[in-house]
Amino acid sequence: MIGGKEKEVFAKIREHLNAVESTLMAFRKLFEVYIRGDVERAEELLKDVEREESRADELRRNIELMLYGGAFLPASRGDYVRLSELIDNVADAAESAAHSLMFAKPIVPKGLEDEIIRLVDESLKTFEYLKGATLALEDSVDDALMLAKKTETQEEDADKIEYDLLRKIFSREDISTYAKLIWNQVITKIGDVADRAEDASDQIMLIAIKRR
């Protein structure tokens, strides 16, 4: 049974999820405009990514304070603290990928523009499932488990796109070695967004199983 303090924590978790989602939306826009060649606009969007990530981080700290202030049974508090940290890592991964792109500003490989955006979109889909799984913890552990498993499946799909994209980049003779190394870093970091979402989904499974 979820009590009053627990409902307050879930309200704050929802707010945290929305902040992480805002980070990811700014991250997506940044990549889209960079791929189109608008570097100046991408620089502006980097500030949006950083601002939203900072907001998410502050909300994570608020959740931890609420938990240590007495919400949930002592045995469960650590699980939810860990979950908030893992969810926050998704925003961190997006910010890191954005920094890697904007610091190096590599030339976009011709013909691969759509595939880069596709990787971004497929990576962000993992968070959509993660968000649903997290919110489901409040009312239905079965739904939480189902959505956590979908997060894992989506991460695997994003992985396949990531590896295929890297293979294409490294097989191209018209891309310099330097550009290949930079894109390897950027693309791997985009994939990290999906990886971090999967990490959080594992924690949701743990919490859901304990509550069954």
UniProtKB/Swiss-Prot annotation:
Any Pfam family = PhoU_div
* InterPro entries associated with the record: DUF47, PhoU-like_sf, Put_Phosphate_transp_reg
| Top-level taxonomic group | Archaea
Tell me which PANTHER family the record gives.
Answer: UPF0111 PROTEIN HI_1603
Q: Which family is it part of?
A: Belongs to the UPF0111 family.
Q: This protein is called what?
A: UPF0111 protein PH1389
Native source species: Pyrococcus horikoshii (strain ATCC 700860 / DSM 12428 / JCM 9974 / NBRC 100139 / OT-3)
